[in-house]
Amino acid sequence: MPPSGLRLLPLLLPLPWLLVLTPGRPAAGLSTCKTIDMELVKRKRIEAIRGQILSKLRLASPPSQGEVPPGPLPEAVLALYNSTRDRVAGESADPEPEPEADYYAKEVTRVLMVDRNNAIYDKTKDITHSIYMFFNTSDIREAVPEPPLLSRAELRLQRFKSTVEQHVELYQKYSNNSWRYLGNRLLTPTDTPEWLSFDVTGVVRQWLNQGDGIQGFRFSAHCSCDSKDNVLHVEINGISPKRRGDLGTIHDMNRPFLLLMATPLERAQHLHSSRHRRALDTNYCFSSTEKNCCVRQLYIDFRKDLGWKWIHEPKGYHANFCLGPCPYIWSLDTQYSKVLALYNQHNPGASASPCCVPQALEPLPIVYYVGRKPKVEQLSNMIVRSCKCS
């Protein structure tokens, strides 16, 4: 028989130790966490980013904003920035969809381009080498609330019958009236109207990751160096001169549009919760009531949030942050919890459970001015892409 002192040991331990040393009982039952003030968390994240950017650029304070020259960036600087951003985007290619998420039906939505009577088209009406198609990102966001929900996006436009063969190109609108090349196509003569389709999934995801506004595409004639014919000979339904009467109504209804295929939010929440059982650290929060560790979206507008005008590009970015509790379960596969409990007894300032921290981070290219000289820099580890419990 063991000594009586050992038999009485459990009775001498304080109540918390009895709970910690009782197998099968989750430590989460002891939680006394208060409700999180999300606005306070966001403000602290914004202030942390302010210091982070200045520190990475080795600046004690923001450059004088009165020295920033007006007008667009020099073409060489803009080209360098665009190529840097494209390289970063290429390195962070979208992951393959999970089989379970890919199994379920996608909701299909059509988002029409902004009506041609909108003033945004005024500067483009007399241009003969291109046609322009603008979209309101708030309309896109109504159909797809979160970027991860988007499965596919296509730009659809209907061309009228044509007797001309022409090489055409598609561009994505960037700021400062610059355009990013997306692809090209050879259009052959046709006796009937024909629908053209372009995969723009990556572009629409970028728009969803930015603030609301007007974004667009340019559909242009290919300009070869040895050709003087730089006129687009393709007529597009909804953009070319309107027909009268009923034909005009049909013409307007068939104007270019985005065809969006996305997982409905309520279905995504179900898939998201099931994925948590397998991988807690690779998901965005699909609602404000998310209960576990995940990526919370946070868009930083340099002017509105930081009061900065000296960063010329981009105007802002999705910094994001990690938030949410991490499971602290007593089970056969988490016996290290015993060690953590003992560690905490001797280190009261240490965390009593795993913390929700960034796992994957991406860089942010920026263009800023030092005096009147523009500089292109890439700031490392600025965008939170996934979180983990650690």
From Swiss-Prot:
Gene that encodes it: Tgfb1
Protein role: Transforming growth factor beta-1 proprotein: Precursor of the Latency-associated peptide (LAP) and Transforming growth factor beta-1 (TGF-beta-1) chains, which constitute the regulatory and active subunit of TGF-beta-1, respectively.
Name recorded for this polypeptide: Transforming growth factor beta-1 proprotein
Region Straightjacket domain, annotated ranges: 30-74
Tissue expression remark: Abundant in the bone matrix. Expressed in cardiomyocytes.
Disulfide pattern: 285-294, 293-356, 322-387, 326-389
Native source species: Rattus norvegicus (Rat)
Chain positions of site Cleavage: 278-279
List of glycosylated residues: 82, 136, 176
Listed InterPro entries: Cystine-knot_cytokine (IPR029034), TGF-b_C (IPR001839), TGF-b_propeptide (IPR001111), TGF-beta (IPR016319), TGF-beta-rel (IPR015615), TGFb1 (IPR003939), TGFb_CS (IPR017948)
Family: Belongs to the TGF-beta family.
Residues covered by region (Bowtie tail): 226-252
Keyword field: Cleavage on pair of basic residues, Disulfide bond, Extracellular matrix, Glycoprotein, Growth factor, Mitogen, Secreted, Signal
Phylogenetic placement of the source organism: Eukaryota, Metazoa, Chordata, Craniata, Vertebrata
Signal peptide as annotated in the record: 1-29
